[in-house]
Every structure is written in C-alpha cells, then in structure tokens.
C-alpha cells in the first residue's frame, strides 16, 4: 500500500496562498496534544512537549504499518497559541503566552495503538507531560494564509487579518490562533520558514 501524505491528501488544509486569506472548512480531526505556557524559546517544557509528540507519532506510524498495513508520513507539528490578554499575544510578550502543541493522528489509527505508543515512549523518555492526550479538534470555518519568514515577523499579517480581513467579511473569532509548521526550524533559515496561519471564525452577526 502506498504511503499516505496528508499534506497532499488534505491539500486544502495543509496549503494556503501567500498574500491573501483562503476560507476553508476544517473537519473534526484527531490530534495528540500537550499544553504549556511561557516563552517556547526558553521553557524546557516546550522542548519536552515536542519530543513527546514526535516520539508518539512515529511509534503510532510504525505500529499502523505493521499491524494494518497502513503507512503514512507523520503530519507536521501544529500549535494553538493565545494569551489571557490578547494584547500580550499581539505584542509578542512570549512569557505570558499559552500554547497547545499537537500532531494530527489519522482516523484509522486506533486508540490501542496510541496506548502502546505511550508505553513505548515512556520507556524511552520517562513520565509523560500531565496534559498529554489524544483528542479531537473541531475548528469548522477558518481563514488561513501562508507566512514565509521568521515566526517573530507574523505580527503584520495577523494585524491585517484581525483589523481588515475579518471585519470586511463580517466574521469574528471562533477559536484560538493556529499555526502549522511546514518547515523544520533546525534546518531552515528563519527568512525561509513556511508557516500556515489559521484562524477559526464565525459570523459576527
């Protein structure tokens, strides 16, 4: 069986225009998730969260291939970001940020494979983060665009979305700011990083 690449199979969700915002209807999708708070560049809990997510995701991928013959490319890392005061998020005061890092899990991967992957990863990494879980995310209607460049340079694009695009379309916030990381920051120069910026919305009326 061919290896499934969800960036291609779900191309409307894992691609976006660079200089405009596309409207997408995101179905309910299953993710393995870890919550945290603080500056991701300084907080060791962030690094541990990402390590756990990848360990689990690859363990589930290999188990799926072995047990059911269904192989797939591990989807990209994604993150939900917010702050109690929206100005702290827009102002890049990262020490006040909260986050949920996550990786999508295909529907055909059963919970038993997650539990087995959890046990395997625990042997390697020790006790998991308390917030580690497998659960669905229901975003529905969203606006998204492709940002190319440093994560710290997203501000003007988000300001345009919040202050121009959303009011013009008569919509308001219906969920947390969502980022999909298409590039590996360990191997990609900051100015070439590709990140999908997504915002769940609903009618403002």
Per-range role (PLM):
Residues 1-205:
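A solvent-exposed interaction/effector surface
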């Amino acid at each position: 069986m061919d290896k499934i690449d969800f960036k291609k199979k779900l191309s409307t969700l894992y691609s976006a225009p660079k200089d405009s915002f596309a409207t997408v209807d995101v179905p309910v999708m299953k993710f393995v998730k870890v919550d945290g708070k603080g500056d991701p560049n300084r907080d060791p809990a962030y690094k541990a969260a990402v390590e756990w997510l990848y360990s689990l995701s690859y363990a589930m991928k290999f188990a799926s291939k072995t047990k059911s013959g269904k192989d797939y490319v591990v989807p990209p890392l994604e993150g939900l970001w917010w702050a109690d005061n929206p100005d702290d998020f827009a102002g890049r005061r990262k020490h006040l940020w909260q986050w949920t890092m996550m990786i999508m899990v295909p529907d055909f991967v059963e919970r038993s494979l997650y539990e087995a992957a959890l046990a395997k990863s625990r042997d390697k990494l020790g006790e998991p983060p308390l917030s580690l879980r497998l659960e669905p995310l229901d975003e529905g209607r969203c606006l998204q665009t492709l940002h190319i460049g440093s994560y710290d340079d997203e501000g003007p694009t988000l300001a345009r979305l919040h202050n121009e695009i959303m009011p013009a379309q008569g919509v308001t916030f219906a969920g947390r700011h969502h980022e999909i990381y298409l590039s590996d920051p360990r191997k990609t120069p900051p100015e070439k990083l590709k990140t999908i910026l997504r915002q769940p919305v609903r009618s403002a009326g």
